[in-house]
């Protein structure tokens, strides 16, 4: 997962607190602040604080300072970081060496005359190490370049914003860098039938979804159906663009990092994956999960000779995504209708993808 921090800017404390507010409002994961301002920042909101103080969440020292400080911080349960200005080859060597110490979590790299080459060298030297590499930049364009260097890119970026309006753009960039791109395909409906009543799950998120977005749900791990959000206007009930009426309690849902959960296990505060018809994804936070007894509908579909199934509520407002990329109500499904799915060759064990033969039917 890519992450980003903002380094507070301003000539006085009041200006710096304004940049803290901007970071909080933009959901930036962390802030690099002066140690004298840690308590003031904590009063404004809950955010990871990086500073040269044992009161910070990430204890930071500069190159040349006593590494024993970080050892002590690590023993007390803190994360640790070393800040290195890259001006010479010796600085590169130091950054690489300090990154291999088991009590250092982050190496933060800043270049006074920045080029990509030193960063490429350090990323290559540290390939396979557990250290998180963080680059310091002054604009979103350079942040994007840092995230993509040598395809792997840095793990994080510290933005020192020259324009405060870039903070929101930086937040959007972090979200985009963490979005997974999934390969979706079409399966052909072979059977639709009512199966009686059961406990079905509605997922109410903290995000507004758009037309073409929903969540991947299914009875089988090898093929999940794109269940559309309640964004479609209809004459019976108001739209609920934050909601996916997902299916019964037993069904799988695809979550971030290619993990699955049972719908019955979801709760407020969990993160789920919102997926659009093109396979583009974003994370969303669950605000509420509702489990209610409702009439259910079995949907079977064939994909590459395999039979896939899911069960959905039998209601006009429940939709899959059809061949034209538009939502199609379950009551309008027919044998031969094409619907979007995500095929998967892997089985699942506690939500993790594994190579194992499992029969699901």
From Swiss-Prot:
One of its GO terms (molecular function) is 3-dehydroquinate synthase activity. Keywords: Amino-acid biosynthesis, Aromatic amino acid biosynthesis, NAD, Oxidoreductase. It is an enzyme of class 1 (oxidoreductase). It catalyses: 2-amino-2,3,7-trideoxy-D-lyxo-hept-6-ulosonate + NAD(+) + H2O = 3-dehydroquinate + NH4(+) + NADH + H(+). Its EC number is 1.4.1.24. GO terms for biological process: amino acid biosynthetic process; aromatic amino acid family biosynthetic process. NCBIfam families: PRK02290.1-2, PRK02290.1-5. Belongs to the archaeal-type DHQ synthase family. HAMAP family: Arch_DHQ_synthase. Catalyzes the oxidative deamination and cyclization of 2-amino-3,7-dideoxy-D-threo-hept-6-ulosonic acid (ADH) to yield 3-dehydroquinate (DHQ), which is fed into the canonical shikimic pathway of aromatic amino acid biosynthesis. This is 3-dehydroquinate synthase. It comes from Methanococcus maripaludis (strain C5 / ATCC BAA-1333).
């Amino acid at each position: 997962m890519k992450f980003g921090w903002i380094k507070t800017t301003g000539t006085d404390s009041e200006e710096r607190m304004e940049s803290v507010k901007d970071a909080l409002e933009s959901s930036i994961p962390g802030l690099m602040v002066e140690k004298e301002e840690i308590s003031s920042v904590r009063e404004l909101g809950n955010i990871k604080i990086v500073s040269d103080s044992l009161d910070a969440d990430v204890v930071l020292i500069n190159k040349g300072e006593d590494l024993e400080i970080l050892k002590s911080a690590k023993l007390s349960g803190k994360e640790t970081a070393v800040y290195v200005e890259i001006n010479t080859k010796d600085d590169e060597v130091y950054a690489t060496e300090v990154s291999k110490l088991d009590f250092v979590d982050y190496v933060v790299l800043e270049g006074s005359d920045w080029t990509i080459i030193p960063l490429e060298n350090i990323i290559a030297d540290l390939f396979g190490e557990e250290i998180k590499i963080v680059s310091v930049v002054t604009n979103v364009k350079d942040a994007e370049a840092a995230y993509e260097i040598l395809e792997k890119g840095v793990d994080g970026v510290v933005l020192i914003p020259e324009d405060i309006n870039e903070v929101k753009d930086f937040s959007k960039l972090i979200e985009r860098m963490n979005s997974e791109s999934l390969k979706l395909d079409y399966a052909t409906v072979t059977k639709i039938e009512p199966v009686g009543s059961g406990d079905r799950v509605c997922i109410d998120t903290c995000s507004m979804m758009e037309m073409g977005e929903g969540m991947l749900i299914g009875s089988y791990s090898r093929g999940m159906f794109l269940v559309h959000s309640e964004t479609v206007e209809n004459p019976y009930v108001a739209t609920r663009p934050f909601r996916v009426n997902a299916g019964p309690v037993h069904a799988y849902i695809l979550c971030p990092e290619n993990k699955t959960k049972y719908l019955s296990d979801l709760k407020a505060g969990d993160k789920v994956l919102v997926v659009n018809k093109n396979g583009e994804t974003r994370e969303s936070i669950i605000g509420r999960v509702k489990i209610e007894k409702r009439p259910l509908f079995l949907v079977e579909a064939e994909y590459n000779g395999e039979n896939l199934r899911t069960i959905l509520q039998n209601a006009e407002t429940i939709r899959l995504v059809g061949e034209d990329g538009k939502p199609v109500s379950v009551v309008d499904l027919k044998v031969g209708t094409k619907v979007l799915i995500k095929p998967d060759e892997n089985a699942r064990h506690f939500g993790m993808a594994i190579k194992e033969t499992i029969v699901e039917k």
